[in-house]
Amino acid sequence: MIDLNGIRLRNRLVTSSSLLGYGAPKGRFAALGLSPISNFVDLRRFGAVTVRTVTTQPREGHFTLKESWRISEIPELLRLYRGALQEADAGWLNAFGWSNIGIDRYFDEYFPRTTGQNRILSLGGFSPDEFASLVERVNRQAPSGSLAAVEFNVSCHNVNFDFNPIIEEVLKRAVPASRFPVILKLSPDFDYLAHAKLAEANGVAALSAINTVKGLRLNPKSGAPLLKNRYGGLSGRAIKPIGLRVVSELREAGIKL
């Protein structure tokens, strides 16, 4: 067991938000339940599983909220995926746009099915009020010890929103209200040093460095963007040097988180 400033991890391997959806599949072809790997790998073995970002209300984003698909509908599902997820050199470019079922449905349908996992719940909002509401719902519905932490996602490129003006107020209001340790997710495309200092000053337990890097992929024939949202977030091996640079700069700046 690892204690990271109050965040208890079973080991050092922590999944990133979205990769494993809500921690359990639902239906044979589950677009948003995701987690097909959970049919083959025991997710309890991870240090922690970071749940796909949830918002106060269900949100379609740039994808779909439809979860169950018949075999005949798979071509349509693949078309939607191509508009939200594209392979890139040494990585993936995604623009799901916080497509999610909403926090209430997560707690009703998925939370009870993943009790053996060490969960980090990623929260996304567009105002301090929304983050305060999300924290209040987590406090009410998640028993003590049932989450390793909550993650504040204020760095998503795919929702076309400027988080910079709200970050300080989000931290001042929502961090003290949370019964669980808070992780702040940093973007290498924003002023991450300033955001890290705000996090340190407002009681955040840890930083997630980094979120995806804003990128673009074009159709080589037409020159049109391949993603529905035009731009997307680049993840994978391609961004590891950027992540290491951000971590190094945070350390050089004296950030203790």
Annotate the PLM regions.
Residues 1-119, 125-129:
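N-terminal capping/small domains of soluble enzymes
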Residues 13-16, 47-52, 119-123, 148-152, ...:
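Hydrophobic faces of well-ordered beta-strands that scaffold small-molecule active sites
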Residues 18-20, 54, 124-126, 155-157, ...:
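Active-site beta-loop-alpha junctions enriched in small/polar residues
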Residues 26-37, 129-140, 190-202, 249-253, ...:
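Catalytic cores of alpha/beta
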Residues 45-46, 143-146, 179-180, 198-206, ...:
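Glycine-enriched alpha-helix->loop->beta-strand junction motifs that scaffold or abut catalytic
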Residues 92, 154-166, 195-255:
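Glycine/Thr-rich beta-alpha phosphate-binding loop at enzyme active sites
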Residues 103-116, 165-188, 227-257:
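Alpha-helix-loop-beta-strand connector modules within alpha/beta enzyme cores
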Residues 135-187:
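Metal-dependent enolase-superfamily TIM-barrel catalytic cores that perform enediolate-based chemistry
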